[in-house]
Amino acid sequence: MNLPETIGEWALADFPVTYDRETIFDYINGAGEVYRSYAFKGVQVGRYQEAGGGELNVEVFDMGTTEDAYGVFSYAREEERRGIGAAFESRGSVLCFWQDRFYVCVAEEPGTDAPDSALEQMARGLSQGLPPGGERPALVDALPEEGLVPNSQRFFHTHQSLNYHYYLARENVLNLGTENDAVLARYRAGPSTLLLVDYREESKASEALTSFRDQITGGIEAAEPRSGAFVASRQEGSYLIVVLESASGEASEALLNSAATRLQTLRR
């Protein structure tokens, strides 16, 4: 996407700058790896001004796929609203949304006097210039619905991302990488934390299951290795189901069974 020269009363103040997978660190150093853990292609950055003195900074990330646009949106979101893009979140002076393969953020420049409606106006204008739609990853929709904590779903690929959301181990015991999909979510019952991973091949799921059980649960399906929190795992075709934290063996077993039933609709 090329940023439009004007959106409503807002006009580009500078020529937009584009960063790719290699130069992203010139723009956002520490957070660059978050985007690179997805199929990130590049980001276009622009600054808009309006006559009243308001100033907005715009970032349009091309995440490569609609699934990864959702993934980076889900990475740290606390709420999810409809009406801009596929979904959006507004926190203070920042509004972010995802749509098709794009993840977009609009931020008010500190110290400027932008109208209260400016963020949504700019976001809607940008949304109109993007391809419509956006489907959540099928793996996210395979999460059991009963007891799911709203907006707790995190879609990602790598071991580093898993440890950011839920620290499992220093080693990559689940053999996670950019070639697989993973989703993590919290549940009220227990409470519990559930991880689903799609390895795309049964043999790879089997290898990951063996590695996880050998290093975390002593080679068995379920155990209590973490200060009263039950951990359990099971393979369902090319998928791995892991209950990372639950208050009881019964709760972890129930969540395993529920997830297995949901995943059967996705079996390759």
Model segments located where?
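Soluble, non-membrane globular domain cores that form compact, hydrophobic packing
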Residues: 1-268
